[in-house]
């Protein structure tokens, strides 16, 4: 297992809750990504949160002993994905941050390609995976757009989220635009990723694609956070992108 990097280039932020054995597979995916990044001279740290995680998930994450082992492991009690990410980002030290979830996978050279793509753009650019492969509960593939594509119009974000939760940007992007609390059962508001995409777009950040990257997204047949938000008829928080009312 590689030793922790003193001054990492990229902080990988990953959140765990009740993934159980699936957490092991996600950490194996990060192991491959980290090995590929280090071969390319990119220093990596992994910052993970255990947010009200069950005993099985805690055991798997704490005992994992390969390249994907978290360098920083935070036990938090917030019960909210956005706040868990904010906590992890506050403890990250990389110039760049990659956001991922505890039951998804990334293509092996994902981080390398993100770093290479980032060098083509200015500091206010957010990168997203090019291809989304959905599996498990149902299977599908989709390509994500860039916001400078002639076919893209920001008005679509009123009714849909054009980019999924996985993103790569400078750490200051995430500290300047934080994730909001999204607990539809308490407030009726949800979809923290959708809201974050709206806010960053409204504040002048560009959304681009990291060419050749693949995000493998587990679509659970039941128990997913997105499904819970949909079942609760959640709305996104008020966003500057559509801030036309007083």
Identify what each model region corresponds to:
Residues 109-141:
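Conserved donor NDP-sugar-binding/catalytic core segment of glycosyltransferases
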Residues 76-92:
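Glycine-rich, basic loop-to-helix element that forms the pyrophosphate-binding segment
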Residues 150-169:
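A recurrent flexible, glycine/aromatic-enriched loop bordering the glycosyltransferase active site
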Residues 187-196:
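Acidic donor-binding loop at a coil-to-helix junction in glycosyltransferase catalytic cores
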Residues 134-139, 210-229:
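Active-site donor/metal-binding and catalytic loop motifs
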Residues 97:
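Short aromatic/hydrophobic "clamp" motif used to bind/position activated sugar donors
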Residues 29, 47-60, 101:
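A conserved acidic beta->alpha catalytic loop
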Residues 19-35, 60:
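Short, well-formed alpha-helical segments that are part of the catalytic scaffolds
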